[in-house]
Amino acid sequence: MATEKQQDNWIKEGRGQGYLKNYKPWVTVRDFGSKGRSHRVYGHTTKRTHHLLSDLELATFLLLDWNPSVTDIREQFPLPLQATTQIAEQAQITHPRVRNALQIMSSDFYVDRKDFRQPNFA
């Protein structure tokens, strides 16, 4: 979880923005200490290093990276704060906060594909 100041800095850094080799993940393996395993892996599809926070993310990434229909892989993709607060409100659950600052949540992956029927998925 990040403080409001950290989140503001990440936005200024351009995290969660860009495509292919210019994409910057919202969260990197260096941002937080972890009790689990994290990985920094080069992606052949995107031509950049990906920040993966678990072995399961690594396994998923490897399947995506070698799939010929995948055109872009963005990991730790930030979700719109307005949308996640609305979902939490509708579900009557508390949206994550740190020091009373709402947290920008992220999806493990946001993937673009050549398939016109389902060109994107998270």
What are these regions (language model features)?
Residues 75-119:
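Active-site metal-binding core of divalent-cation-utilizing nuclease and nuclease-like domains
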Residues 1-81:
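A structured, charge-rich N-terminal accessory region that forms the first stable segment of a protein
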